[in-house]
Amino acid sequence: MEKYELLKDIGSGNFGVARLMRNRETKELVAMKYIPRGLKIDENVAREIINHRSLRHPNIIRFKEVVLTPTHLAIVMEYAAGGELFDRICSAGRFSEDESRYFFQQLICGVSYCHFMQICHRDLKLENTLLDGSPAPRLKICDFGYSKSSLLHSKPKSTVGTPAYIAPEVLSRREYDGKMADVWSCGVTLYVMLVGAYPFEDPDDPKNFRKTIGRIVSIQYKIPEYVHISQDCRQLLSRIFVANPAKRITIREIRNHPWFMKNLPRELTEAAQAKYYKKDNSARTFSDQTVDEIMKIVQEAKTPPPSSTPVAGFGWTEEEEQEDGKNPDDDEGDRDEEEGEEGDSEDEYTKQVKQAHASCDLQKS
């Protein structure tokens, strides 16, 4: 860890803490996500790292390496100085149609590349889209903790993601197409940018997950009268918010949609993007670590630290997190563990989903 020096903490969540670090030699700023050694280092962590490592696209946060400390596994990534798109929305209230399109175009290009690489993200949302520090911000998709590769993993069937962004078929507990669920989440992201609110939440009762679920499965949303957007934009949203994923617009169709094509930056055109889609297995990733090297480090990280004594600069121990009022197992109630191999813990949202199933409130497809 002599390679990096600590600058400041930049976030915390279910995984632990994230810190802004600087490479002592190159002076490059990086973000480091610290995960406590031991039980938290599971198949999901390995999946996140391996999936993320395989991706090389300007609209995806670059994975650099993993580092083992005495107390934590640290994932080293590109630092996005512009912060979360969520914070930008909170500051602005909502975006104009043109600004919303600018970010949506980048989001779709990043997701399209993920899908080409046979990886579905499964937790796309404003909080998982970062911005670089440039005057015309470049959007960067991050957090592949729920991602699945169709080449490496089974077809998803568990209810994961964030309630406001979740697609109807994900609630069914049956197998579903993760790529089409990503399309739905992209639509929710677009709606929030345009309106400044979530499409399927009751504004008077936003924490009522049961009501949100009901609105999702019945496609109950509307665009407020005070939001003036084009007919093309409305039509695109209506093609995304379709309950049957087989009838939902695809990423390919979105990229050819008139609203999406308008004012499309040159670097996002299909001709410019083609270089990222070359099937060249010898192409370098952003990481110098091989998969075998990474898996060896991850395996070693499964061994808990010998003691809970904090080590300066190596992240917080769980005791420190709890003293600061941060329960490492809490992440604002927006995460649900994978069933079976990924745990049996339930949050309030999961309970609401199960209650809805039990009372036949969910429409089975």
UniProtKB/Swiss-Prot annotation:
What this protein catalyses is: L-seryl-[protein] + ATP = O-phospho-L-seryl-[protein] + ADP + H(+); L-threonyl-[protein] + ATP = O-phospho-L-threonyl-[protein] + ADP + H(+)
The protein's PTM annotation reads:
May be phosphorylated.
Among InterPro entries, the record links this protein to: Kinase-like_dom_sf, Prot_kinase_dom, Protein_kinase_ATP_BS, Ser/Thr_kinase_AS
Description of how activity is regulated: Activated by hyperosmotic stress.
List the residue ranges forming a coiled coil, or say none.
none
The GO annotation for biological process reads: abscisic acid-activated signaling pathway; protein phosphorylation
Task: List the biased-composition ranges (Acidic residues).
Answer: 317-347
The protein's matches in PROSITE patterns, at most eight in alphabetical order, are given as:
PROTEIN_KINASE_ATP, PROTEIN_KINASE_DOM, PROTEIN_KINASE_ST
Q: Residues in domain Protein kinase?
A: 4-260
Work out whether the entry's keyword set contains ATP-binding. yes
Q: Residue ranges of region Disordered?
A: 298-365
Its keywords, alphabetically, are: Abscisic acid signaling pathway, ATP-binding, Kinase, Nucleotide-binding, Phosphoprotein, Serine/threonine-protein kinase, Transferase
Tissue specificity remark: Expressed in leaf blades and leaf sheaths. Expressed in shoots and roots of young seedlings.
Q: Which residues bind ATP?
A: 10-18, 33
Q: Which SUPFAM superfamilies match?
A: Protein kinase-like (PK-like) (SSF56112)
Instruction: Say yes or no: keyword Transmembrane helix present.
Output: no
Query: Entry's Gene3D superfamilies?
Result: Phosphorylase Kinase, domain 1, Transferase(Phosphotransferase) domain 1
**GO molecular function annotations of the record:** ATP binding; protein serine kinase activity; protein serine/threonine kinase activity
Q: What is its EC number?
A: 2.7.11.1
What induces this one? Weakly induced by hyperosmotic stress in leaf blades, leaf sheaths and roots. Weakly induced by abscisic acid (ABA) in leaf blades and roots.
Give the family, as the similarity comment puts it: Belongs to the protein kinase superfamily. Ser/Thr protein kinase family.
Q: What does this protein do?
A: May play a role in signal transduction of hyperosmotic response. Can phosphorylate ABI5 in vitro. Can phosphorylate BZIP46 in vitro.
Q: What is this protein called?
A: Serine/threonine-protein kinase SAPK6
Question: What organism, scientifically named, is this protein from?
Answer: Oryza sativa subsp. japonica (Rice)
- The primary gene name is SAPK6
